[in-house]
Amino acid sequence: MSANVLKVNDVTMQFGGVVAVNNLSMEANEGEIVALIDPNGAGKTTIFNCITGVYEPTNGEVVFCGETIAANHPQGKMRKLYAGENNGKYTRVVRLTPDKITRRGIARTFQNIRLFKTQTVFDNVLIAMHLRRTSNVFTATFRLNWKEERAMREETLRLLEIVGLAQEKDELATSLPYGKQRRLEIARALATKPKLLMLDEPAAGMNPQETVELAQFIVDIKNRFGLTVFLIEHHMDLVMDISDRIYVIDFGRKIAEGTPAEIQDNPDVITAYLGVDEE
């Protein structure tokens, strides 16, 4: 049985009177591609933000590789949680910052591609490498740790070769076609050496051929790097083609989970996506 990588336990996220995520539980195991879909477009990115430290959940907890990285139990008893500076202490709230979560092995991309627009393809990936190295931008700039810098440059080039962007390494990131910009963003996430890769609408803005190529690319990098992949996506063909398991939420509440075949035949999912004719 594969080890559990991500576990979301009874997470609720509320903004004022709006409940974006309602008591959601889900998990992803080692080596899986798990998708989260929502016909109403609400709640998917919110749960991503709870997992990656952008939001503190209103209630519930997020566990990554056995460690609690986010938790809020306002109505519960003080619990012994294990996360960074909270290690071994009794507390109701745990919230690791996004940079600490990245260093633990979670990387994400965004629906709207976020690249360093004035930097080259090569430098976009190299900058991401610094997040997991002992050197920083200052030491790299003044070559205070030249051996580590050289190793990072070699690794950056190798990663660009793997994702098919080595020939464009000296071009500005924004000069790339949209599909290649998405590959670059994923390459930058891979540069942090994640265990869990979270993809937020990776096929957004792509044409059908680019979407087909992206689907194969996701499977290839998952296998090559031994990743667990968690994605949210509107392109149902992509989701059904590559996912091992799928969770479906409707207005922030989970209505179904299962294999692609099970989800396609689930009456609650069919109703949520297609509606019910009124008599």
Named regions from a protein language model:
Residues S2-E279:
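Glycine-rich phosphate-binding loops of nucleotide-dependent enzymes
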